Amino acid sequence: MRINIYQLDSDKDENRVKFCNYDFTQKHGGVLPQSYKCVFHGDVDGNLEDVFTLFNTPEHPGTYQGHSLSVSDVIEVVGENEKGITPGSYFTDSFGFKSIDFDSSRCAEMDGVRMLMIQPHKTPVVTYVKQDLSSLQRAVSDHCEEAF
């Protein structure tokens, strides 16, 4: 499924709700898209729990620019998917995920250069990669195949 992941930008988090659960966040100004930044855009397999697990391991996709997926992060499911997850935005809560209204167009974009990621058997996706050797290597490392 195609997803975007958004994390609070500490410099823009005026209500200091980074890593706080949904109820606390609501009591302190709500989930404000303008305080978030996109840290991943791409395709992953599985459901929301699988996404949480994937982005808490060293094997997360090479274009991921965030910290381990945590409470207060937002996962946006884009379009239809084989898992039957309703497209929309999901707040990562203390336990599970809460469907929320979230205008991702108000979030800051990812850092780096724009890149078209083409993977076998998947729809191409535009993403961003930081302009340093390590980030560029990680972005393509999972997608290179030997040809003889």
List the predicted regions and their residue ranges.
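N-terminal low-complexity, intrinsically disordered segments
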Residues: 109-140
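Short, flexible beta-strand-to-coil junctions
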Residues: 1, 6-12, 75-84, 118-122
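Short structural boundary motif marking the start of a folded domain
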Residues: 1-4, 88, 109-116
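Cysteine-nucleophile amide-bond enzymes
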Residues: 2-5, 62-64, 95
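Short, compact, well-ordered microdomains
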Residues: 66-107
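Short, conserved turn/kink motifs that form compact alpha/beta structural patches or helix kinks used as
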Residues: 33-82
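Extended boundary segments
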Residues: 1-44
